[in-house]
């Protein structure tokens, strides 16, 4: 009897270790902050001269705009990132699509809903219709037809949210508000999840997009109508429609009558109630330049019943419980989430795989910084990641220095501009009079920075005599250098008044003549 139990025990032990290892690999537990899942940048890359970027071109759709930054630029290629910015107008629907590389989305403004479709996960949102036959109803017969719709979880998004987009995962977005949704997408094309060429590719499930010179169509357009209709079990006429051959609306379409699907009820006083679901309908009482029509009420003779997916009589395995229930978004703008706060300088908020586990799937992280008037950020360098800095509001003087001690960037970064800061390059930032807010996207799920000044900084950690001999200064000066910012962390209050208008400005620098962004 003992001999028969041992092989079974050994078999189940192997299965447990295999599953445990697979889950650890899936959620990034095999990576330490000092390791990277990236393929590395192009060899021979040089970040000798950095520049602030703005969108290079625009693609107009029926209900929005997609703006592309120049991913062919050497700085984007060397950092292995691709950036786009989308504007989705009210009642606009970003059609389902997926990408070859993982990415992060930051919602600059607006609100709406987004859905991420994970393969193999159950459709936990269930909707039941009772559609009445109008002809039979007129004849006194009350026969009805039961219809059913199931879909995966839908997430409410708003300003300040960061949404994680794993590679190959279908996502869509709908604007149910009265103002446009503006979102920045940053993709890590050098991530190991991308085994295609190191550039961002969009795979549309519907619609089309004229990103390049040629007109890009959705993935169904390349199949023959006959084979497609047979594979999907639909008529050839329906197969031709989903190919969107003559659809000129683009990738963002307008749903003028409102979009209906199940959503979690959001309470004003509390968190999301997962047991109550409602259909989406556009705002009727709002009248803006983006509004096309009013939202329809339910069709006559139609009743709707909602059922929470929690009541399903269905067993869940470990993958569904850990993978399918992951949160797709976190809000990084909430002041209560700040990791460091100085009431006279500003606050810093980090999103990493520790407080946002889904980032293990995309192997990226984000940091949002709010600097008050004339506040300065401690000089630092990124230890294990490149950084893509996007200015949300205000202006800041940014200086970046390379390993030769040469200034590779020294300019004012304005609202809407983007700056790529290479790994290990030292950066110094100071807010202008109006202050500034920006977000930095990092190419690792647990980004690490090394501050030069302040609490827990490099200068604070070095002995006084090491500083005195290294810089040929007195012990008192060394003590001041080490401790003057010793009680501050991250964001500093300005201590020394600037003399004249020559602060940070090199002779002949043209940035002083540039106009303000606002």
UniProtKB/Swiss-Prot annotation:
The keyword Signal applies. GO terms for biological process: seed development. GO terms for molecular function: nutrient reservoir activity. It comes from the Eukaryota. Residues 1-24 form the signal peptide. InterPro entries: 11S_seedstore_CS (IPR022379), 11S_seedstore_pln (IPR006044), Cupin_1 (IPR006045), RmlC-like_jellyroll (IPR014710), RmlC_Cupin_sf (IPR011051), Seed_Storage-Functional (IPR050253). Disulfide bonds join 45-78, 121-324. PROSITE patterns: 11S_SEED_STORAGE. Pfam families: Cupin_1. Residues 50-240, 330-479 form the Cupin type-1 domain. Residues 281-295 have a biased composition (Low complexity). Belongs to the 11S seed storage protein (globulins) family. This is a seed storage protein. PANTHER family: 12S SEED STORAGE PROTEIN CRB (PTHR31189:SF35), OS03G0336100 PROTEIN-RELATED (PTHR31189). Hexamer; each subunit is composed of an acidic and a basic chain derived from a single precursor and linked by a disulfide bond. This is 12S seed storage globulin 1. It comes from Avena sativa.
